């Protein structure tokens, strides 16, 4: 399998496919791609809390039972959405040969895409990649890059999992409240932590989540880089 191609421009828009008339699609176009398009449209309007199979059926102008001819559950629809979103994760730098920069680009892109879709993370974190073509294309590109960089084959998947675990947690951090580490009335009993939080605030970073992500990612790169063959 060849490496994934350049990431499309809009990671949160409709899935690629033939354009249709404005308005609800006819039942004749109901397929997995059409379901993915409608699911993204519904999520964009109502968020994940408003995403139900009944609401999706209304968006598609079909009976709920018609959906189940193509997907067996809401989870299956989320799998389709996840696979579509994964196609917007940028893995093109792995073709250039600079492993560290490729991992940086991949990790930042991965985090940015899924920071807007954190309700999917508990699903995809335990989701088999079987029959998810865009997800598998991403992993193939990353694995090929790791292999070319001199990683022992048996270390490639554990290294990817380690980085992904960090990415998924960091995606939540992007939308965390600014006062998440405010110790409040317990400041006196947690002086070291409170001082560290205050010192970070004094740095005046616009995006503290980016500071943490950069620090953690560079530490991962340094540690994992030691596994590469000389």
Q: Could you describe each region identified by the protein language model?
A:
Residues 181-230:
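A structured, mid-to-C-terminal "fold-capping" secondary-structure block
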Residues 33-45, 76-94, 101, 105-109, ...:
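Alpha-helical structural segments
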Residues 42, 113, 145, 223:
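Short alpha-helical functional segments enriched in proximate histidine and acidic residues
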Residues 1-30, 195-203:
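N-terminal intrinsically disordered/low-complexity leader segments
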Residues 91-137, 163:
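Hydrophobic alpha-helical connector segments
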Residues 34, 38-76, 80:
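Helix-turn-helix
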Residues 138-187, 224-227:
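Hydrophobic alpha-helical bundle segments that form small-molecule/ligand-binding pockets
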